[in-house]
């Protein structure tokens, strides 16, 4: 009887030990999703959002943020990724590029005395040079011989008479004064040079040199009335005359 009682007690103890092991295993399985959610917060948030009611979404997100901070504490290299030199260089390049683009967008064009400037600073964009006619140059030189400096009313009157702007007259007089001073330093007489240049510019063509279209007339070559080439036909014999001469020689 004692042996049977001992066998029953051994079976009961083995059953109780097996049941305790099963309870511990089930408890570990229930705690493992919580640990997994602590290490992988994104999956836990997705799982909770898909299977739970929307009213519990705020609680799950808050728990997910806490678990995310804990995961960053567990992996410190992830928290220092934003301080990497590559990301810092990219951020610095973007900031410098945005700062460089700001002044270009704020630039405005300003026109001063016929010259275009950007914000009143920087390089000037020069307009093309003004080409004066011979009559305009003669009037400007004549007025420059009278006076090298013009008052505002005189400049306006001269510009209106020549059909140019006051700025063009002002610039022409400035350039003329600088050339005049250079010629004086070189020991030349600028007035004589101006008079010579004016006579050459306004003098008619020399009659000793015939024009190109009068060369044929000067040589006495006759031209046919309805042709543009001079009559050189007497230099060449026609093919009919060549055949007649050959038949006579035979």
From Swiss-Prot:
Gene behind this protein: dll1
DNA-binding region: 125-184
Region spans: Disordered: 40-66, 84-106
PROSITE patterns: HOMEOBOX_1, HOMEOBOX_2
Single GO term (MF): DNA-binding transcription factor activity, RNA polymerase II-specific
GO process annotations (BP): cell differentiation; embryonic skeletal system development; regulation of transcription by RNA polymerase II
Protein name as it appears in the record: Homeobox protein DLL-1
Subcellular location: Nucleus
PANTHER family tied to this protein: HOMEOBOX PROTEIN (PTHR24327), HOMEOBOX PROTEIN DLX-6 (PTHR24327:SF26)
Keyword entries, A-Z: Developmental protein, DNA-binding, Homeobox, Nucleus
Listed Gene3D superfamilies: Homeodomain-like
